[in-house]
Amino acid sequence: IAINALVRFIKKDTLDIGEITASFMRSFENYLKTEPSYKGRYTGGAVATDKPKGKRAVSLYPSRIRTIHNLAKLEYNDEDLGIVRIPLSPFAKFKVAPIPKTKHRAITIEQMQQIIDLPYKEYVRGGGEPVFNLAKDVFILSFALLGMNSADFYDASVISGNIVTYQRVKTRTRRDDMAEMKVRIEPEIKKLFDKYADPTGERVFSFYCRYKNADIFNKMLNIGLKDIGKIIEVDNLQYYHARHTMATLANNKAGVDMYRVDEMLNHSDSSLKLARIYVERDFSVLWEANRKVMDLFN
């Protein structure tokens, strides 16, 4: 995504690394502050929206360029042998702005229970199932499947028994473990799971049959969630609230420690990168933690 933004900035597909200077990076940062947000990130057909780019992107994209620049210097320079093919150090003068903390988007345990208890809207003849019903169901599924993202619901293709295995779309290209996650289908959501299971077996869920791409699927979810938000009195309820709520309730109500919550969210702790190579990941401890969260509800 950062590279795509850089290509839009320079208006060409190639860039000599010597052109990346502190002045260049400041110009790129200023460009990001005025560039609109783009949709279609996961489908390769990104198009501009009428929304401004968030502060997180303005910090994150330059940090990605810095990482690439540093890796290139490690690859092509050898100071011990006097080989310095990339002499510039633009990030000594250009300081990447710190990534702002994500605003908490958790709803209360009572509001989550309200969503679970909401009655479905009736079908409209010839109009298919209301997006209200879809949004309610997938929000609950996400909450119960460790905050699974909509792009992963759309993309997941591996299931064995009651275990879904997927590589998180958002981060799989940035991690050595492909951001692999294994989630267990709890009894409470078995009927919902069966409702949306892919009858062809090509993927885990049938959402890809209903919607052209993951972005359209996510958009429809958020349309339905706006109506649900009005009922439970949450302004601008969005799909990501499910993930935040799962994590918050796990820690605050179910007594799951913060380290385990981080694992439930499939985050990667850079300080444990070496340990990850030697220690096989045990997903069952995450399922046990998730069981504690499920037991908070009727």
List the predicted regions and their residue ranges:
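C-terminal catalytic core of tyrosine-transesterase DNA break-rejoin enzymes
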Residues: I140, A144, M148-A151, H241-H267
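Basic/aromatic-enriched alpha-helical hairpins
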Residues: I1-T43, V47-T49
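Conserved tyrosine-mediated DNA breakage-rejoining catalytic core shared by Y-recombinases
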Residues: Y154-K195
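Long, amphipathic, Lys/Arg-enriched alpha-helical "connector/arm" segment
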Residues: R41-V47, A92-L134
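Active-site/catalytic core of tyrosine-dependent DNA strand-transfer enzymes
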Residues: M112, E186-V234
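Short, polar N-cap/turn motifs at the start of nucleic acid-interacting alpha helices
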Residues: V158-T165, D235-N236, G255-I277, N298
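Catalytic-site neighborhood detector that most strongly recognizes the C-terminal catalytic loop/helix
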Residues: R168-T173, L265-D295
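N-terminal DNA-binding recognition helix of tyrosine site-specific recombinases/integrases
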Residues: A5-F9, S37-P90, M148
